[in-house]
């Protein structure tokens, strides 16, 4: 397994990755998704023999805040440490950044995963998060 910077947006591999985890709403506007990737702070991929099997995408200013926008690992590759490696790659790259944030599903599985890599729920820190969709 190789973790490295993601190169140019490849429609087929991104589509396959998003479909593999059921994130099909992102695929309804491919040109927007492609622009989002191009304008991201960083995108890092996980590769199994050159096959993209996981990806993490971060946005922000890279100085005071980094927001983990997407983290996806194909279902057959989950529970093998790939998500942790992707997160750690971003955390290492932006280790001096004051604040790193993400939004995720409110399940025990996801909360346990993010806590295991050093994240805290905002309410655990006396904060509240707001979102407008």
Identify the residue ranges that each predicted region occupies.
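Active-site rim helix/loop that mediates acceptor-substrate recognition in acyltransferases
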Residues: 22-43
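Short amphipathic alpha-helix that is part of the acyltransferase structural core
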Residues: 1-27, 125
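Hydrophobic adenine-recognition pocket in adenosine-nucleotide-binding enzymes
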Residues: 6, 71-73
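Conserved active-site alpha-helix within GNAT-family acetyltransferase domains
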Residues: 84, 106-132
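Conserved GNAT acetyl-CoA-binding A-motif
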Residues: 93-105
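Conserved beta-hairpin
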Residues: 34, 41-56
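Conserved acetyl-CoA pyrophosphate-binding loop and the N-cap/start of the following alpha-helix
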Residues: 77, 81-86
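A conserved beta-turn-beta hairpin within the catalytic core of GNAT-like acetyltransferases
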Residues: 60-68, 124
